[in-house]
Amino acid sequence: MNEVKSVGAKYIALTGPTASGKTAAAMAIAQQHDVEIISVDSALVYRGMDIGTAKPTVDELAAVPHHLINIRDPLQAYSAAEFVADAQRLIDDIAARGKLPLLVGGTMLYFKALFYGLDDMPKADPAVRAELASEAAAKGWPALHAELATVDPVTAARLAPHDSQRISRALEVFRVSGQPLSFFHQQNAAKTIADDGREERTEILISLEPQERSWLHHRIAERFDAMLAAGFVEEVKTLRARGDLTPDLPSMRCVGYRQAWELLDAQEARSPGGSFPMDELRDKGIIATRQLAKRQVTWLRSMPQRQIITCDTDQALPLVLQAVAQHIEKSSR
């Protein structure tokens, strides 16, 4: 299952942790090559979530054709399986029109699903998820984390007691299948085929990765400050005011949105109409974004076929453009 799959046409994939400069690099590639961009970002699919997702600007969207952005209402889910189907269709369509598909984003699960296929584990069960959400509301997520530790200690050991999304999925898998989530991960790992010796691929995965974490942390803080200045809290207030969204939805679990929603709830309970704790949101949002970046880097290390470009140097963009040009020349021979 983990042998890299052909998706029909050659393409270029550009990834890296959040705030590593993927959008700027993609736009630079687009200036030199006739590309269409396919977003590989589970947050950018949602309409009305522009500021907190660092969505490409109106000018950027107009300058280069983009796909898989603004395709879902925040009330809807969008799975890795749906992404793979959409991405494969778009790759073939873009290539058929004589253009180069450029996949850009940091949702590593999507990349892994596209490259290697999906894990052979149980599908989501809405009834079980609702049951778990009800139990969590009554007992709290730490209690469900403790339950997980009894049936799947391997998975529980790597999850925080309040990691609701992952605790819910792990317990859901166990209740549906009778097997722990770690069992399916082990089965998948056993099928992994080493990259060495694979046939030459017609795709390339470029990964922007910093040498110094402090550089990335500074960029994350700068970007979150810019989001706050651009009206991120008002964006979350607008989403909450719809009345049909809840903090348990995948859209509202996105980094930044979850923290803002929780603080807005706390403010209303404590002092309706009082001042919003902007400094607290800044701290929580930056910490959560750093944690996201750390998880993304961990995912990247499981993709040995990637071509690493050090992004915290002045040569990052020239090196990306060079790698793209060399790959296009090589694959056209």
UniProtKB/Swiss-Prot annotation:
<feature type="region of interest" description="Interaction with substrate tRNA">
    <location>
        <begin position="253"/>
        <end position="258"/>
    </location>
</feature>
<keyword id="KW-0808">Transferase</keyword>
<feature type="region of interest" description="Interaction with substrate tRNA">
    <location>
        <begin position="165"/>
        <end position="169"/>
    </location>
</feature>
<dbReference type="GO" id="GO:0006400">
    <property type="term" value="P:tRNA modification"/>
</dbReference>
<comment type="subunit">
    <text>Monomer.</text>
</comment>
<dbReference type="GO" id="GO:0005524">
    <property type="term" value="F:ATP binding"/>
</dbReference>
<feature type="binding site">
    <location>
        <begin position="18"/>
        <end position="23"/>
    </location>
    <ligand>
        <name>substrate</name>
    </ligand>
</feature>
<keyword id="KW-0460">Magnesium</keyword>
<comment type="similarity">
    <text>Belongs to the IPP transferase family.</text>
</comment>
<keyword id="KW-0819">tRNA processing</keyword>
<feature type="site" description="Interaction with substrate tRNA">
    <location>
        <position position="129"/>
    </location>
</feature>
<dbReference type="InterPro" id="IPR018022">
    <property type="entry name" value="IPT"/>
</dbReference>
<dbReference type="InterPro" id="IPR039657">
    <property type="entry name" value="Dimethylallyltransferase"/>
</dbReference>
<feature type="site" description="Interaction with substrate tRNA">
    <location>
        <position position="107"/>
    </location>
</feature>
<dbReference type="InterPro" id="IPR027417">
    <property type="entry name" value="P-loop_NTPase"/>
</dbReference>
<keyword id="KW-0067">ATP-binding</keyword>
<feature type="binding site">
    <location>
        <begin position="16"/>
        <end position="23"/>
    </location>
    <ligand>
        <name>ATP</name>
    </ligand>
</feature>
<dbReference type="Pfam" id="PF01715">
    <property type="entry name" value="IPPT"/>
</dbReference>
<protein>
    <recommendedName>
        <fullName>tRNA dimethylallyltransferase</fullName>
        <ecNumber>2.5.1.75</ecNumber>
    </recommendedName>
</protein>
<dbReference type="GO" id="GO:0052381">
    <property type="term" value="F:tRNA dimethylallyltransferase activity"/>
</dbReference>
<keyword id="KW-0547">Nucleotide-binding</keyword>
<comment type="function">
    <text>Catalyzes the transfer of a dimethylallyl group onto the adenine at position 37 in tRNAs that read codons beginning with uridine, leading to the formation of N6-(dimethylallyl)adenosine (i(6)A).</text>
</comment>
<feature type="region of interest" description="Interaction with substrate tRNA">
    <location>
        <begin position="41"/>
        <end position="44"/>
    </location>
</feature>
